[in-house]
Amino acid sequence: MYTIQREEVDGADAMPVLRVEMQGITSGWAQRFLLVSDVHFDSPHCQRDMLRRHLDEAAATGAGILSIGDWFDAMQGKQDPRHTKSDIRPEYKGNNYIDAIVDDAVKFLEPYREHIIGLGDGNHETAISKKLETDLTGRLARRLQVPRLGYSGFVQFRFQRNEHGGRTSVNMYYHHGSGGGGIMTKGTLRVVRQAAWIPDAHILVSGHIHELVRRKLQVYLPV
């Protein structure tokens, strides 16, 4: 199993670090994590049955769950120029749209609360913060009592064999993403650029463009 600790870093440009500690590492040991992005939970296009199956599997295997933004869709408020009547779920057709989607997300995620290691922001949440001055991710994280992360940051996975030593760590940098993905590259060029200025990250992840791409990079550092 694991423990988590969110570390605040001083400085306007500093990013938060979420530390995940794992001990008792032996041969054959394994710890799983479920990384999700762009769920758009309140959209009628969200495949909630599939989402629930993934979360159920994570809970059954003791996996940690990390969301890196756009858990909410939040596009159907009456002040949003993108809203359409066909893209709002029936249960949200009231005069408390924002409250309703937060309440529903809390109810949906409550069974998995103890497995959630962090909830991050996406462009849909930050748009609501700018327009309506309410923090969707913060509200959800507070009610679930789980760590609230930012639009980008670090997750450091720390492994320790026993109390006498045998320590190592893996650094993951996450960024929700921005802009388009590119027809051919599907967002991989942005990751290559990130690898150049974040050389200490062993893993780089991002979402936003709704593409599934995995790529192995080599970064050479001076000794």
Can you say where each PLM-predicted feature lies in the sequence?
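Conserved beta-sheet core of the metallophosphoesterase superfamily
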Residues: 67, 171-223
